[in-house]
Amino acid sequence: MSCGNEFVETLKKIGYPKADILNGEDFDWLFEDVEDESFLKWFCGNVNEQNVLSEKELEAFSDLQRSGKPILEGTALDEVLRTCKTFDLKTCKLDDKEIQILEDEVQTLQKLNNSKIQRRNKYQLMVSETSYRFLALNAKQEEATKKLKQKQGFLNSVNTKLSNELQGLTEEVNNLMIFFRNSNLSERTNPMVFLSQFPLGKYISQEEQSTAALTLYTKKQFFQGMHEVVESSNEDNFQLLDIQTPSICDNEEILRERRLEMARLQMACICVQKQIIYLKTSNLSMKSSIKWAEENLNRLTNEVIDKENLDAEISSLNSEILKLEEQITHIKDKVLPAVVKEYAQLLNMPVVKGDFELQIAKQDYYTARQELVLNELIKQKASFELVQLSYEIELRKHWDTYRQLESLVQQLSQRNTVLCQHLAVLSDIPASEQLTSRTPIDTKDHSTHRLYELLEGDNKKKELFITHEHLEEVAEKLKQDVSVIQDQLAVSTQEHFFFLSKLNNDVDMLCDALYRGGNQLLLCDQELKEHFHQVESQLNELHHLLTDILADVKTKRRILATNKLHQVER
């Protein structure tokens, strides 16, 4: 314990009226001075209630002061006591035996005094220890009370939270019970909220219509028998095509027909090309003969040719014709068939290319239609799987809800059985064992004792035996305290409301004073601002007058400086 706290405790012991509101730490500075420390320690260790004057003694002393009689104090009192001692020594003459007896008595009294002083010091030490323990116990009690209040607050919060959760659970159960009403209720009061409650007839009819439309489409678009493949979802009808195996186009009859067709095309091409070549050669020969005839006619008309020259020319021309005929027959018999045959063979490439392009186009067309049908089938399958998955999820949720409700029913049944057992035990108590209001509570009834401790609170006075009547009294007192606290809370709330209303009025007055009914904040008084504006305008006018006067003075000085006559007059 600090010195300041000991000083305050000493003041409390001697009965100082305002010692309870003093703080011991505020008096620690008094013990810092060495001269005052010894006195203060003596004061804290020796002064008690016996050193304090009673009210009667104070009244007697005040009466003595009012009477005007002299009061001996200080040195005057010491001198009087000294004279009294000398007078006693002079007047009283004692024997040696009496002196010896008195000395023995003095020694015994001194010993008794010393023993009492030791006992007093021991008691003071015990008192200080007891006070220290009392303060420590008070601190522990305050801490325990604080912890108890915290625990009570925590338990209250847990209780409220549990109550809210139970209330929410009750509401959820009530909402859930609406969904499982009897089927005789109207549809308006029994809404369908689960997927299993909705009929699937419309959905199935739409899917059947979609399947029928898809089947009709496959009948129109694909070869015969494709719609049967679409209608039956047998896995044997859906197999991957192996590139290594021969296709339908590799049949021997089809290949033979194609070879014959290509041979016919080649023969037709050869015949056509020969006819074209013959026609072209005949046309060219006709044109050349006509041209030659025209030239010779012109020449015969313009020139006169001898018969001998004409015969020689005819013979030369006949020889040239023979040579040309030989060349033509050579080309016709040997060169032309080989060229035409080679050209006919080259005709296979565009024909085969066109055939393959036609097959590729057909294959692309069928592939696009197959992809369209496949996408529709995938969508239909996805919708079926989605509905199935939704039903499975809903079924799982129903199973989870069912298990939770089963566990809840089991717990409630267990609680119900326990409650019935408690009620049976309470109802089976005989009349002879029923507790009256004055019967003490059993020490084994911990719940009632705990209730009594909670109701009693910080009361230091502990009862040896607790009765139901006492418990009712404590509960009634607690009820009265609660009502008083509620009244105080209502009064404080009303005072707080009045304070807030007054504060709002003050704020409104301040806003009126600052804004003056406008939206702009006024940082100064409006009247003072107007006076400042007037003073500023007057100062501006005075400044203009001074500038005019100075300008006039400058002009006059300039005139005086230039005109000597004015200077003489001045």
Swiss-Prot record:
Residues annotated with N-acetylserine modification: 2
Entry similarity comment: Belongs to the HAUS3 family.
InterPro entries found in the cross-reference section: HAUS3, HAUS3_N
Location in or out of the cell: Cytoplasm, Cytoskeleton, Microtubule organizing center, Centrosome; Cytoplasm, Cytoskeleton, Spindle
GO BP field: cell division; centrosome cycle; spindle assembly
Entry function: Contributes to mitotic spindle assembly, maintenance of centrosome integrity and completion of cytokinesis as part of the HAUS augmin-like complex.
GO cellular component labels: centrosome; ciliary basal body; HAUS complex; intercellular bridge; mitochondrion; mitotic spindle microtubule; nucleoplasm
Quaternary assembly: Component of the HAUS augmin-like complex. The complex interacts with the gamma-tubulin ring complex and this interaction is required for spindle assembly. Interacts with EML3 (phosphorylated at 'Thr-882').
Top-level taxon: Eukaryota
Lineage of the organism: Eukaryota, Metazoa, Chordata, Craniata, Vertebrata
Keyword Transmembrane helix: no
Coiled-coil residue spans: 90-124, 154-178, 284-336, 458-495
Key words of the record: Acetylation, Cell cycle, Cell division, Coiled coil, Cytoplasm, Cytoskeleton, Microtubule, Mitosis
Protein name, per record: HAUS augmin-like complex subunit 3
